[in-house]
A protein has these predicted regions:
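Short Lys/Arg-rich basic patches
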Residues: 72-81
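Aromatic-lined glycan-binding groove of carbohydrate-active enzymes
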Residues: 35-72, 107
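Structural preference for beta-strand elements that scaffold enzyme active sites
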Residues: 19-25, 47-51, 122-124
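Glycine-rich beta-alpha junction loops
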Residues: 2, 28-32, 54-61, 115
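Hydrophobic packing residues within well-ordered alpha-helices of enzyme cores
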Residues: 6-9, 43, 123
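Conserved short secondary-structure transition element at the edge of the structured enzyme core
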Residues: 55, 85-128
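Glycine/proline-rich, positively charged
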Residues: 1-38
Length: 128
C-alpha cells in the first residue's frame, strides 16, 4: 500500500463518521524496509500503530544461514518469493544480526525484535 492510499482511507473514514484505522499490519523487518519511505511517516503523523507480519523474515533473521532444513523451509513458496531474490545482499544483514547476537549473548530473533521495537513497532505478529 502507498502512503496516499492509506491517507485517503483515513479521510473516507472521517467523512463517513467511521472509526479511522488505528493499527496497520504491514510487511516490515530488517530485510524489508520499504514502508520507511512513505507509510511509516504517515503512521507516526496519524498516531497509527504498526503490527508488522514476518518480523523474522520467514526465519532468515533467526539463523545464520539462508537455507532451512525444515520441510516448510524447503517448500514455502511465499517466503522464497519474498526473500530469495535478494539473498546475497540480505545475507550481509543476517551476518550483522548474528554478530550482534554473539556480542550480546542472545538469540538472533531477539536482535530482530529489539530493532523493531526501537523503530516504534507496537506488536510484531509471529506464528509458532
Amino acid at each position: 500500500m502507498y502512503g496516499y492510499q492509506f491517507h485517503n482511507m483515513q479521510i473516507i473514514a472521517r467523512d463517513n463518521h467511521w472509526t479511522p484505522f488505528s493499527t496497520m499490519e504491514n510487511h516490515y523487518n530488517l530485510l524489508y524496509r520499504e514502508d520507511e519511505k512513505e507509510l511509516i511517516p504517515i503512521f507516526q503523523q496519524k498516531n497509527v500503530s504498526l503490527m508488522p507480519y514476518s518480523p523474522l523474515a520467514g526465519g532468515h533473521l533467526a539463523r545464520n544461514t539462508w537455507e532451512s532444513n525444515t520441510s516448510r523451509g524447503k517448500t514455502d513458496r511465499v517466503v522464497h518469493s519474498k526473500y530469495d531474490h535478494f539473498e546475497k545482499q540480505d545475507m550481509e544483514i543476517v551476518k550483522c544480526v548474528d554478530e550482534l547476537a554473539h556480542k550480546y549473548h542472545c538469540k538472533m530473533s531477539q536482535i530482530a525484535f529489539a530493532w523493531q521495537w526501537a523503530k516504534g513497532v507496537s506488536s510484531p505478529i509471529t506464528i509458532h
